[in-house]
Regions:
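Solenoid-like repeat scaffolds
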Residues: 18-23, 37-42, 71-80, 106-116, ...
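Residue at a conserved register position within TPR or TPR-like alpha-solenoid repeats
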Residues: 3, 57-59, 92, 128, ...
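"A position-specific structural signal for the A-helix of alpha-solenoid helical repeats
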Residues: 1-5, 52, 87, 119-126, ...
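Residue-level detector of the short coil/turn that links helix A to helix B
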Residues: 24, 61-62, 96, 132, ...
Length: 301
């Protein structure tokens, strides 16, 4: 674990590790923990190791085959152990298997026998959102808001409730709640606050396409985004449109040239704005060229 965490330290801070005589590599730490997972004499720690390995893998290497391996190792354990339920749900989301993720969350151990883990209600609400099931999503988000006594994910939850009313075409000013409730320590809450301060929600078709994409429903996302009209009145959304189109087509194994073309359009349109679509498009192009072993182009992007 220490090797993995030290290996995750950004390069600009390696001098601190060297000063302290420390060294590590994420791949080394993960492989060492993988050995622990398979060792009979550490069987008593299997659940904890599975949890740590899964989240380190998602955040450091993001190897789909290993994520699937850990998911298989969990098996039906998610029904009996709340930690494994959380782990399985995050692995499945990372693998784009939202229907299975929802099944896992719906079949978690009863909260009567465990300390309440309200974040799982938030995750379940998100899983419903990815299916565009607004009724069930709203129910879960409201349950989370009414029961969770912490500060994180509160703004984010109100943000999702604002999305639901917007996508339904109804009126309800959740933006006031985003501004006044919770805090903005984590990224999800920061994004919610920023959008509330700007009174901004993207085009409804792009938002639906984003949600479907995040749930792994790539064909449905493509169908949704294809109905977006690339016309002058929608010009403020063009950088997002081309970025999301590129991401969807990348998952659907479209030809690299078409995917790159989409990302280049997003980059050229958005590079003079504060939106994140241009830099993210450049990153995706760089990753494609890296995969093609065209390292000079990859580095330039």
């Amino acid at each position: 674990l220490i090797h993995a965490l030290l290996g995750a330290v950004p390069e600009q801070f390696h001098w601190i590790l060297e000063l302290a005589g420390l060294q590590g590599a994420a791949s080394l730490g993960l492989s060492e923990m993988d050995e622990v997972l398979n060792a009979n004499n550490f069987k008593m720690y299997e659940n904890e190791v599975l949890f740590l390995l899964s989240f380190l893998q998602i955040n450091l290497n993001n190897n789909s085959e290993l994520c699937q391996k850990y998911l298989n190792k969990i098996g039906e354990g998610y029904k009996e152990n709340i930690l494994l339920n959380f782990t399985a749900a995050r692995l499945l989301h990372n693998l784009g298997q939202n229907d299975f993720c929802l099944k896992v969350l719906e079949n978690r151990p009863s909260s009567e026998s465990t300390f309440p883990f309200y974040y799982l209600d938030y995750l379940q609400g998100m899983s419903y959102m990815y299916k565009l099931d607004y009724d069930n999503a709203k129910q879960k988000f409201e349950y989370f808001i009414n029961n969770f006594k912490g500060k994180n994910y509160i703004k984010s939850t109100y943000h999702k409730l604002a999305w639901i009313t917007y996508l339904r075409g109804t009126e309800d000013n959740y933006f006031n709640s985003i501004t006044n409730e919770g805090n903005a320590s984590i990224d999800e809450d920061k994004v919610a606050l920023r959008d509330a301060e700007r009174n901004y929600i993207t085009h409804n078709r792009l938002l639906r396409a984003r949600l479907l994409y995040d749930g792994g429903y790539y064909e449905d996302a493509l169908l949704e985004i294809s109905s977006f009209k690339v016309v002058g009145k929608n010009s403020m959304y063009f950088d997002e449109y081309w970025y999301r189109s590129g991401r969807i087509k990348l998952e659907l194994d479209y030809d690299d040239s078409e995917v790159i073309n989409n990302f280049e359009k997003s980059y050229n349109i958005g590079k003079s704005t504060a939106n994140y679509y241009a830099p993210m498009s450049a990153l995706q192009i760089g990753l494609i060229y890296e995969k093609q072993n065209d390292f000079s182009k990859a580095e330039s992007y």
